[in-house]
Amino acid sequence: MIWKRHLTLDELNATSQNTLVAHLGIVYTHLGDDVLEAEMPVDARTHQPFGLLHGGASAALAETLGSMAGYLMTRDGQCVVGTELNATHHRAVSQGKVRGVCLPLHLGRQNQSWEITLFDEQGRRCCTCRLGTAVMG
C-alpha cells in the first residue's frame, strides 16, 4: 500500500460535507493499494445545457480524486494543492453515473502527478485527466 495516511471510505466521504464535492454528489467508493475511486451522478447537477455531462463536472471529479489521493500521500503538517489539470473528453454521457479511477504517475517529495480516468456505466472510457499537485508544508 502506497498511502501514508490511513483513512476509511467513511472518513474520506465525511471530508466532503458542505463542499462542491457533496453538491455534485461525488462519493468515494474504493481505496486500494495504489488506487482511489469515486462515482458521480450524471443528472441536472452535472449536466451542461444540452443534457450531457458537463466537462467542468468531469474536471471537478478528476481534481477531487487526484487531490484526495495526493493528500493521502502526505504526512502530518502537509497538504497538496493542484497546479495543473488536463482533461480529454472521449465520449458523451447523458445519464447514470460516471466512475473515476485515480492512479499515481509520479510521487515526488515536492510534486505529484495523477492519472484519473472516467468510465460510464458500461465501462467505456469517457474522459482521461492528468492532475499535477504540489506538496505544501
UniProtKB/Swiss-Prot annotation:
Record-linked InterPro entries: HotDog_dom_sf (IPR029069), PAAI_dom (IPR003736), Thioesterase_EntH (IPR026576), Thioestr_dom (IPR006683)
Q: Tell me where it resides.
A: Cytoplasm
Kindly report the protein's main subcellular placement as a broad class.
Answer: cytoplasm
Q: Cross-referenced Gene3D superfamilies, in alphabetical order?
A: Hotdog Thioesterase
> Is Cytoplasm a UniProt keyword of this protein?
yes
Provide the Gene Ontology terms for cellular component.
Answer: cytosol
Instruction: Give the enzyme class.
Output: hydrolase
Question: What Gene Ontology molecular function terms does this protein carry?
Answer: 1,4-dihydroxy-2-naphthoyl-CoA thioesterase activity
- Active site residues according to the UniProt entry: E63
Q: In which pathway does it act?
A: Siderophore biosynthesis; enterobactin biosynthesis
* Disulphide bridges, residue numbers: none
In terms of domain of life, where is this protein from?
Bacteria
Q: What is its EC number?
A: 3.1.2.-
UniProt KW Hydrolase keyword = yes
Q: Cite a single Pfam family from the UniProt record.
A: 4HBT
Recite the UniProt keywords alphabetically.
Cytoplasm, Hydrolase
Biological process terms from the Gene Ontology for this record are: enterobactin biosynthetic process
Q: Which family does it belong to?
A: Belongs to the thioesterase PaaI family.
Q: How does it assemble?
A: Homotetramer. Dimer of dimers. Interacts specifically with the aryl carrier protein (ArCP) domain of EntB.
The record ties this protein, via PANTHER family, to: 1,4-DIHYDROXY-2-NAPHTHOYL-COA THIOESTERASE 1, PROOFREADING THIOESTERASE ENTH
> Function, please?
Required for optimal enterobactin synthesis. Acts as a proofreading enzyme that prevents EntB misacylation by hydrolyzing the thioester bound existing between EntB and wrongly charged molecules.
HAMAP family in the cross-refs = Thioesterase_EntH (MF_00907)
Kindly provide the name given to this protein in its UniProt entry.
Proofreading thioesterase EntH
